[in-house]
Each structure stands twice: as structure tokens, then as C-alpha cells.
């Protein structure tokens, strides 16, 4: 329940509303709103896990219903829901912001640097949080407080950015919402144009298939390595946690290549192929030849794939969608992606249970079937990439 609470509002339509707000109100308002939601959500979660919550009237009321689910978990889930809304809204706002500031310039490099910094941040938090939690006395409150502080710094940083963006609008002759007064404004009916675009659906389905084989895989990766290599959970986690760092190092370089040489659709195809190869190695090679060297090799391949696809995918959206509804286009892609990310872990969990009947706790799992399912997503994503390349050749979007 807690793990899925981050996606609940987004799957049930908040992301669509977020895109409309972004296109109607502009990047400054939406950015501050999204950063505020993340900070508020984290603050609620912090209160829910802190000692101040224990014995409070809120705890008494929350524990009076659905007694099998602790009151602290209920409040933390509420905070995580609010945080999740802000996080996804921030994602589409950052994408549209970079598209605005770097249109006609090094947009793919800028997006690559943004993704690289984000992945370094994820690595840092996953490294620092356990250390903070295990400091005497051990408590989960400390890392939550640390992350809440980071979100406050992020909110203040974006407020500073709004002054810079307002100055840019004056230089470009844009209105208060960052729009060109001579261009047609966003209308809610523009959502129909997005849904009616064939190339939008190709990109959206490629996105959901690719990321469904990345993020849900991360949930199972540690146990998969533990089962295949016969190592401890900590050792397996230490092997896999370097995956985002490899992607962070390569993504800006690929973004720069995309800006100067193109080949965006080709990069998507190769990224999907590499992901398929990685999951097939985990499905068949690693179980037959348990080796940390093979595991690291497959993770490096996945890291290159995770650089190729995002570096080419997100800068491609402004080329296929009009600027006035670009925010809604990003939000709808994120919305479709969130549906996949909500459902796919359950599919993999069922496949794992199906292929391991009568599994005894403490023994290794057979991950062949789940890895084949992940690889199948890569195959379909590759075919969609080929289709996208053909559409680009016909319609001249400029992806290549």
C-alpha cells in the first residue's frame, strides 16, 4: 500500500491536470507549485515517522480505522501521495523548462546533464540514507529529515530561478506565462490532438515498455543477483547500486552527440537492443555461469542502454509536439508510464511466483521467466523505435 501510494493520484488523472496547469499557467507557477507539493508531502511523512506523532490526537484517530494498517503508515502514505504528485509535476515542468531555455541550442545536452545530476543525487541519497539511519541510535527519522531538507533547498533554488526566467521572458518579448502573444494559446481541446497523434502513441508506448523493464527490474535486481551469485543481499545491492552512476557519466555525452549529429531514433533502437541483451544475459547466461564479472558486464550494458534511450527520448518530444501543448504531451507520456509502472511489478511478482512453486524462504529464486518478460519489453520497444524512425523519414520531424 505504502509503495504504490506514490503513483495513485498520478495514475487516476492528476498528471493530466498537471500538464494542463503547466500549459495554462507556465513553468514558473507550476515549478514552485510542484516543489511545494514535494516539500509538504515529505514534511507530512517526516511528522508521521517522528516521535512527535506518537500519542497525538491524529495518531489516535488514524489508528481507530483500518487497524491492520498502522496510523503512522497511513500518514506517511498520504505524504508520499502528495510528494508523488509534486514529483511527477516537477518532472514535466523541468522538461518543458529545458525545452524553453535551450530550444535551437544544446537541448539534448542540457537534458542529459539534468538526468545525470538527478542520478548522481539518487546514488548519493541511497548511499547516505543507510548511514544516517544506522547512526546510534538507529532511526528512520534521520534520513527522512535529511531528504525533507534537500526538498526545501530545491524549492528555494527554483524560486531563485523564477527571477532568471522572468528576465528571459522580457528579453524574448514573452508574456507573464512565458508564451508568445502572437501564437495560439493552449486549450483543453488540444488534448484531443495529442491523443490523435500516431507518433505520440509510438513514443508513449516505447517509453512505457522501456521504463517498465528498467524501474520494476531495479526492485528485483538485488534479489536476482543474490539468487544467481549466491552472495549476501548487501553484496548484491553494492553491485547493482553502481548502475545509475554509469548512466550518469554517459548520458550528457550522448546528449551532445544528439545535438550535433542527430540519430535520435537510431539511439532509441540501439538502447532497446542493449536492454534486451542485458536481460537475456541475466535470464540464461548468469544462472549457467555465476560470475560477478558477468553481472558487472550486464549492468554496464544496461547502463549504456539507460543512457541512450533517455538521452534521445525526452529531447525528441518537442520535435513532434507543438510548444503550446508540450507540457500536456509530457504529462500524458508520464501518465501512461505511471500506469505501466503500477501494473508491471505485479506481473513480474506473479511470474516469479508461477516459476517458483512451493518456494521456501531463504532459498534462491529462479528468475528466468521474469527476465525473459523484461527482455520481451525490449524487443517490442526496439520494433517501436524502428517504426518511429520510419515515421520520421516520412514526416521529417528531425529526429535523425
Model-derived features: where do they sit?
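C-terminal transmembrane helical hairpin of 12-TM major facilitator-type secondary transporters
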Residues: 264-313
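Extracytoplasmic gate region of multi-pass secondary transporters
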Residues: 197-251, 310, 344-345
Amino acid at each position: 500500500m505504502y509503495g504504490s501510494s506514490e503513483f495513485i493520484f498520478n495514475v487516476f488523472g492528476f498528471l493530466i491536470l498537471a500538464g494542463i496547469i503547466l500549459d495554462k499557467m507556465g513553468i514558473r507557477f507550476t515549478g514552485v507549485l510542484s516543489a511545494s507539493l514535494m516539500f509538504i508531502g515529505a514534511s507530512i511523512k517526516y511528522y508521521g515517522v517522528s516521535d512527535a506523532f506518537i500519542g497525538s490526537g491524529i495518531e489516535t484517530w488514524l489508528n481507530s480505522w483500518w487497524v491492520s494498517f498502522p496510523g503512522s503508515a497511513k500518514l506517511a502514505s498520504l505524504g508520499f501521495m502528495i510528494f508523488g504528485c509534486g514529483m511527477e509535476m516537477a518532472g514535466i515542468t523541468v522538461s518543458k523548462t529545458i525545452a524553453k531555455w535551450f530550444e535551437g541550442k544544446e537541448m539534448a545536452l542540457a537534458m542529459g546533464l539534468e538526468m545525470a545530476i538527478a542520478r548522481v543525487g539518487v546514488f548519493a541519497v541511497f548511499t547516505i540514507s543507510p548511514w544516517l539511519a544506522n547512526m546510534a541510535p538507529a532511526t528512520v527519522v534521520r534520513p527522512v529529515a535529511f531528504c525533507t531538507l534537500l526538498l526545501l533547498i530545491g524549492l528555494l533554488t527554483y524560486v531563485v530561478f523564477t527571477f532568471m526566467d522572468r528576465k528571459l521572458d522580457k528579453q524574448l518579448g514573452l508574456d507573464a506565462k512565458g508564451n508568445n502573444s502572437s501564437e495560439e494559446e493552449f486549450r483543453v481541446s488540444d488534448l484531443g490532438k495529442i491523443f490523435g497523434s500516431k507518433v505520440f502513441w509510438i513514443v508513449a508506448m516505447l517509453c512505457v515498455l522501456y521504463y517498465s523493464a528498467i524501474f520494476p527490474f531495479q526492485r528485483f535486481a538485488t534479489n536476482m543477483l543474490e539468487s544467481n551469485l549466491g552472495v549476501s543481499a548487501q553484496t548484491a545491492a553494492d553491485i547493482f547500486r553502481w548502475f545509475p552512476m554509469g548512466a550518469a557519466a554517459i548520458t550528457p555525452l550522448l546528449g551532445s552527440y544528439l545535438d550535433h549529429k542527430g540519430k535520435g531514433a537510431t539511439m532509441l533502437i540501439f538502447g532497446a537492443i542493449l536492454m534486451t541483451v542485458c536481460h537475456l544475459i541475466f535470464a540464461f547466461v548468469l544462472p549457467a555461469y555465476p560470475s560477478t564479472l558477468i553481472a558487472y558486464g550486464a549492468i554496464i550494458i544496461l547502463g549504456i542502454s539507460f543512457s541512450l534511450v533517455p538521452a534521445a527520448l525526452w529531447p525528441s518530444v518537442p520535435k513532434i509536439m507543438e510548444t503550446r501543448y508540450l507540457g500536456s504531451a509530457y504529462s500524458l507520456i508520464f501518465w501512461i508510464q505511471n500506469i505501466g509502472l503500477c501494473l508491471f511489478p505485479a506481473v513480474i511478482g506473479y511470474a516469479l511466483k508461477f516459476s517458483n512453486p512451493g518456494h521456501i524462504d531463504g532459498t534462491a529464486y529462479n528468475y528466468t521467466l521474469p527476465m525473459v518478460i523484461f527482455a520481451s519489453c525490449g524487443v517490442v520497444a526496439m520494433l517501436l523505435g524502428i517504426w518511429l524512425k520510419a515515421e520520421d523519414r516520412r514526416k521529417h520531424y528531425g529526429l535523425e
